[in-house]
Swiss-Prot record:
Pathway: Metabolic intermediate biosynthesis; chorismate biosynthesis; chorismate from D-erythrose 4-phosphate and phosphoenolpyruvate: step 7/7. It comes from the Bacteria. Its EC number is 4.2.3.5. The gene is aroC. PROSITE patterns: CHORISMATE_SYNTHASE_1, CHORISMATE_SYNTHASE_2. The lineage of its organism: Bacteria, Bacillati, Cyanobacteriota, Cyanophyceae, Synechococcales. The keyword Flavoprotein applies. Belongs to the chorismate synthase family. This is Chorismate synthase. SUPFAM superfamilies: Chorismate synthase, AroC. It comes from Prochlorococcus marinus (strain MIT 9515).
Length: 364
């Protein structure tokens, strides 16, 4: 089913943007894992609407409720149910759009598939659905951190045509979160914020690129052919709202190189299980399996589809109309998408870790 993700570390999200609540059921989490609930809440706060002048003005505290699966902060190995209640819904903002197919939204395709759709807030297509992913991903991050000291760092690399260059060796979470746009390059971040504000005042929006770095990745994650690690990462990240592109390692720029330039040569080592490579054009994955190097990815997000300008479209009768959106929306989704990217990467790695252990650790 389309609301379920993962094979062993398995999540099922539920809820709509303007419904009573949104949440997740996480199944397959190993027992006896100590969970810091404050860290889950912190990830939700990073995703929360209304956190700055360049995000949607919708006001939600996004307070986490854990209904099952933990005892005194320790996982039981049973399903972990988590939810966040919606408190600032305004479905009346969408009354005039009930039968309108908004440009580049899911209204038209949902109607074509189901013959019915949630009229307000985008329903399941809303980024509010990602609350469940972020909550479950925060647990996955703690599992990976506990076992391998794995660290997942995502940041805004580009907004519109304003790009940044970041020293990944000095990258920290505190640097990423040092400004409201979540770009660790302070000078570039200032320009990004200004660009978003300008477009916001014009009733317009913009997109950009989020980059993700994963450090201390255990080798051996992923499988050949259909369950390659990069394939599952691509699927996970492209399932996020507004995503339009994914690349790993050298990505599309690697097509400009020769094989002699692109190949990642292994370095001599006394421990064959701790191999290193001279370069990392592969982005930490070869043959669909992690090699222990950093995993490096980029994800492209389109401009927010809801804008304050008049646009021509059609209604459910196929008649052309002119519409102007109301409601509360982000002029740029990227600052709030950073924890979403972190979470989807964590969910994939946690699932592949358990799959690897199940297949390859039973016989010594």
């Amino acid at each position: 089913m389309s609301s379920i993700f993962g094979k062993i570390f398995r999540v099922s999200t539920f809820g709509e943007s303007h419904g009573g609540a949104v949440g997740v059921i996480l199944d397959g989490c190993p027992p006896k894992l100590k969970i810091n609930i404050d860290l889950i809440q912190n990830e939700l706060d990073r995703r929360r609407p209304g956190q700055s002048k360049i995000t949607t003005p919708r006001k939600e505290d996004d307070k986490l409720e854990i209904l099952s699966g933990l005892k005194e902060g320790i996982t039981l190995g049973t399903p972990i149910a988590m939810l966040v209640r919606n408190k600032d819904q305004r479905p009346e903002d969408y009354n005039n759009l009930e039968q309108v197919f908004r440009p580049s939204h899911a209204d038209g395709t949902y109607h074509l598939k189901y013959g019915i759709q949630a009229g307000s807030g985008g329903g399941r297509a809303s980024a509010r659905e990602t609350i469940g992913r972020v909550a479950a991903g925060a647990i996955a991050k703690q599992l990976l951190k506990t076992l391998f000291n794995t660290e997942i760092l995502s940041w805004v690399k580009r907004i519109h045509d304003i790009d940044s260059q970041v020293n990944k060796n000095k990258l920290t979470l505190s640097k990423i979160d040092s400004n409201i746009v979540r770009c660790p390059d302070e000078k570039v971040a200032t320009k990004m914020i200004q660009r978003i504000k300008e477009l916001q005042q014009e009733g317009d929006s913009c997109g950009g690129v989020i980059e993700c770095l994963v450090k201390n990745v255990p080798s051996g994650l992923g499988m050949p052919v259909f369950d390659k690690l990069e394939a599952d990462l691509a699927k996970a990240l492209m399932s996020l709202p507004a995503t339009k592109g994914f690349e790993i390692g050298s990505g599309f720029l690697g097509t400009y190189l020769r094989g002699s330039e692109h190949n990642d040569s292994f370095v001599e080592s006394d421990d064959i299980n701790k191999l290193k490579t001279k370069s990392n054009n592969s982005g930490g994955i070869q043959g669909g399996i992690s090699n222990g190097e950093n995993i490096e990815m980029k994800i492209a997000f389109k401009p927010t589809a809801t804008i304050g300008k008049e646009q021509k479209t059609v209604n459910s009768d196929g008649k052309e109309i002119v519409m102007k959106a109301k409601g509360r929306h982000d002029p740029c989704v990227l600052p709030r998408a950073v924890p979403m990217v972190d979470s989807m990467v964590a969910l994939v790695l946690a699932d592949h870790l358990l799959l690897h252990q199940a297949q390859c650790s039973i016989i010594k």
